[in-house]
Amino acid sequence: MKRFLLATCLVAVLLWEAGAIPAHQVPVKTKGKHVFPEQETEKAWGTRAMEPLEKDDQLRALLPVPKQKLAATEEKHSDTMTWVETKDILSRFRNPLQGPELDLDSIYHPMSEDVQNEEVPQSRPILYRQVLHGPEEDLDHISHSLEDSGEP
């Protein structure tokens, strides 16, 4: 239990230092005003949420940048940084090819006529027929013992 509490405190301190947990920007107690703390928190978060993402460099690396915006920022920062254009790897699923599929049967099946015309000998299983004359012999004693039958 002590280790869990210590680990939780350590994670909280690391997140606080990294800036993941925002500091309290609005005091809970105000002088002379009767304002609910939830409203002040919403105002504080609203202003934080409206700030542009350019100020937050941590999120810029995670979010995809549109190509128009990429070209505009490339002109501004061409001397300091070089931008790599992102490739849309899902475009073939969003825009499927028109027309029939390619015929790829030749990969798995040979195309030569000699192989196709050649008949493969098929072996048929030999069925043995047993003609019974009269009633069938009782073979239950092989799989069932007398003890299992429950007869005295």
UniProtKB/Swiss-Prot annotation:
Q: Where in the cell is it found?
A: Secreted; Endoplasmic reticulum
Which is a GO BP term held by this UniProt record?
A: positive regulation of intestinal lipid absorption
Provide one Gene Ontology cellular component.
extracellular region
Give the range the annotation lists for the signal sequence: 1-20
Does the keyword Cell division belong to this entry? Answer: no
Sorted UniProt keywords: Endoplasmic reticulum, Lipid-binding, Secreted, Signal
ATP-binding among keywords: no
Q: What is its main location?
A: secreted
Q: Which GO terms describe its molecular function?
A: triglyceride binding
Q: Which InterPro entries match?
A: PRAP
* Listed transmembrane segments: none
> In which tissues does this protein get expressed?
Highly expressed in the small intestine where it shows a proximal-distal graded expression.
Assembly: Interacts with MTTP. Interacts with MAD1L1.
The free-text function statement in the UniProt record for this protein reads: Lipid-binding protein which promotes lipid absorption by facilitating MTTP-mediated lipid transfer (mainly triglycerides and phospholipids) and MTTP-mediated apoB lipoprotein assembly and secretion. Protects the gastrointestinal epithelium from irradiation-induced apoptosis. May play an important role in maintaining normal growth homeostasis in epithelial cells. Involved in p53/TP53-dependent cell survival after DNA damage.
Name of the protein: Proline-rich acidic protein 1
